[in-house]
């Protein structure tokens, strides 16, 4: 059972992950993301990938985040703890393709702001579960605030299925064994 929520300092928050080379290795883009997060002034948990931490330190940006009262930096979490963080978040902001798929599952059903110019997961975007965010700090701040201010988000059916793939596979295997 996950105990990660005992360490979360916000009752409501945005869960954020950033790790893609095109975002973290580019000083201008990384600065835009950080400025966008800080500018929104919304409670944000950043699961800080080692590569991202290294680049934040290299570009002298880590202190900006550490000194921001509405940002909580945490180390990367195991799968179950990360699922608990997603489940308890208002929404997720990420550049991760895998997370874009995970959050649309029927068990999580969260919206995601995608910190990229394009995505290999157009199904999530077409289903209204994900939105691409242009990587300019004003766009990031505006998108965060718009998503945060939504009172009730109508989540559509997951474009990746209903979460019962394992039972369907088992049925087929049993039928032909």
Predicted stretch roles:
Residues 44-46:
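Short loop-to-beta-strand entry elements in the cores of soluble alpha/beta enzymes
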Residues 49:
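Conserved C-terminal portion of the radical SAM core fold
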Residues 1-42, 52-177:
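Nucleotide-activated sugar donor-binding and catalytic core shared by glycosyltransferases
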């Amino acid at each position: 059972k996950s105990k990660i929520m005992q360490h979360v300092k916000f009752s409501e928050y945005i869960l954020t992950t950033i790790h893609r080379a095109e975002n973290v290795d580019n000083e201008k883009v990384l600065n835009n993301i950080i400025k966008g997060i800080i500018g929104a002034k919304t409670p944000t948990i950043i699961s800080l990938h080692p590569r991202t931490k290294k680049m934040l330190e290299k570009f002298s940006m880590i202190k900006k985040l550490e000194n921001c009262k509405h940002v909580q930096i945490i180390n990367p979490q195991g799968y179950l703890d990360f699922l608990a963080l997603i489940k308890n978040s208002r929404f997720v902001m990420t550049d991760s393709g895998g997370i874009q798929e995970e959050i649309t599952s029927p068990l999580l059903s969260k919206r995601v702001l995608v910190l990229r110019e394009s995505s290999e997961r157009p199904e999530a975007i077409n289903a209204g579960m994900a939105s691409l965010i242009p990587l300019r700090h004003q766009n990031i701040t505006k998108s965060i605030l718009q998503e945060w201010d939504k009172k009730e988000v109508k989540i559509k059916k997951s474009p990746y299925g209903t979460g019962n793939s394992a039972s369907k596979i088992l049925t087929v295997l049993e039928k032909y064994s």
